[in-house]
Amino acid sequence: MKFMIKILITGGAGNVGGALARKLVENQKYFVVIADDLSTGSKDKLPSSKYTNWTFVYCDVNKYEEISQIMLVHQFDYVFHYAAVVGVSWTQENPIMVLNDIEGIKNILQLSKNSSVKRVFFSSSSEVYGEPVELPQNEDTT
């Protein structure tokens, strides 16, 4: 079967990325590549093995050499970028990892710019709230 639309989901073993992947593979016109380093994700969140139109690749998108190979091989139509450190307290405890995530989106945008990628979908995180005044944080505390 020829797959018409190739989709990359970074962070696809996380909550949001995994839910998106599970929904997309229900439609056979999509071929989904899930890239995740499993630092916060879980293989339990991947789509069912009954679907054959997806694959999992262990990858750290913050490392250009890892994600560039995947992008080159697959020539994606769309990229959903969900790979990031998640959770306000986790990001506070790991500020260097948060800064490393900037490399991830830079890599995705740079590799997508002159490729077959038609659109990149970027989901932000709790980092948009800035330094917390109190925890837990919500829209009213910023």
Where are these regions (language model features)?
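N-terminal Rossmann-like NAD(P)+-binding domain of SDR-like oxidoreductases, especially those catalyzing
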Residues: 1-142
